[in-house]
From Swiss-Prot:
This is Peptidase B. It catalyses: Release of an N-terminal amino acid, Xaa, from a peptide or arylamide. Xaa is preferably Glu or Asp but may be other amino acids, including Leu, Met, His, Cys and Gln. Binds 2 manganese ions per subunit. The active site is at K207, R281. InterPro entries: Leucine_aapep/pepB, M17_PepB-like_N, Pept_M17_PepB, Peptidase_M17_C. Its EC number is 3.4.11.23. It comes from the Bacteria. One of its GO terms (cellular component) is cytoplasm. Keywords: Aminopeptidase, Cytoplasm, Hydrolase, Manganese, Metal-binding, Protease. Belongs to the peptidase M17 family. It is found in: Cytoplasm. It comes from Salmonella typhi.
Amino acid sequence: MTEAMKITLSTQPADARWGDKATYSINNDGITLHLNGKDDLGLIQRAARKIDGLGIKQVALTGEGWDTERCWAFWAGYKGPKGVRTVMWPDLDDAQRQELDNRLTIIDWVRDTINAPAEELGPEQLAQRAVDLLCSVACDSVTYRITKGEDLREQNYMGLHTVGRGSERPPVLLALDYNPTGDKDAPVYACLVGKGITFDSGGYSIKQSAFMDSMKSDMGGAATVTGALAFAITRGLNKRVKLFLCCADNLISGNAFKLGDIIRYRNGKNVEVMNTDAEGRLVLADGLIDASAQHPRLIIDMATLTGAAKTALGNDYHALFSFDDTLAGRLLTSAAQENEPFWRLPLAEFHRNQLPSNFAELNNTGSATYPAGASTAAGFLSHFVENYREGWLHIDCSATYRKAPVEQWAAGATGLGVRTIANLLTA
């Protein structure tokens, strides 16, 4: 068996022969990472990516200076979608090791689930995986209901049914109740709503191949909020939280929805479809209606919703939208505490009115007259949140997935956002 490469930390610069910008050096004893006190976690993550690029698949983190955050930064960069990597972790106290183990279990579940091929992960499989994860951490406190196919239409989940009816794999709504109180009448503290589009072709507003090839990841919001709830439970979440995953394929067929169709929602809103590739908001609307009916103190929806958010922030930040300044500030505080990247983008009352339709109350997409696509998408969703000005956060999760590797991430899912939402739930 190959001996593990030893990885140590140092606050001293590398030998001058490595250059004055060297972040790591190699000697007979292994690899040394040279911390500079400026962005040590980022330095460790980037170095881990380089170590993986050298083909080193077994490492041992040794010596002083390793803690949970530094171990996790190393793993975030070291993990990739292909092959097996083995890490021998340093000695940590029980609390730190438990935290690390929970991250390895749950956030890796999120990354692996998002990376799974669409052929293997349809709407029903995604819902069942979410149930399995949450039952693995708190089965005695979890109940759930899965509604699919024609049952959705009969129960007036018209957005989800309309988007998903074009696929042979029926659309699915997972409604999961985490209630650790034992009181079936306990108030619901929070609702999490996730977009679970397991493959997005764009429908009849079809995507080009260059924009479709990563669309197995269009369920990243659903996977992330599922992981966030599971992770919050491992951190001691003792409040009742409900999870709604809106899962579907968006495909082309003789039964697929078309431009000009009008969707009539349970809350009385009518929406004209003018872009079948703006389907995420159509399925989320059903989840938000259900979430609002619980009258929680907090609603968080998460979705890979718009290219506009990605244009603004790249894959480096999740975009945050809210009318509730206090709540937005709390989430940004949680993000800072967890070293995760979130950035707030504008959401104003006028964005709610920038989706005009000649035939319905709302259009499902903006026009060239109103080009702030990420903000108008958030404005659209607000029509399905009963008290949208308080207690609601919308996250357009641009940092969920990377099509190609970069200096700190392998190609594929990142798992970013799990810790921040869990932090907010347990604060």
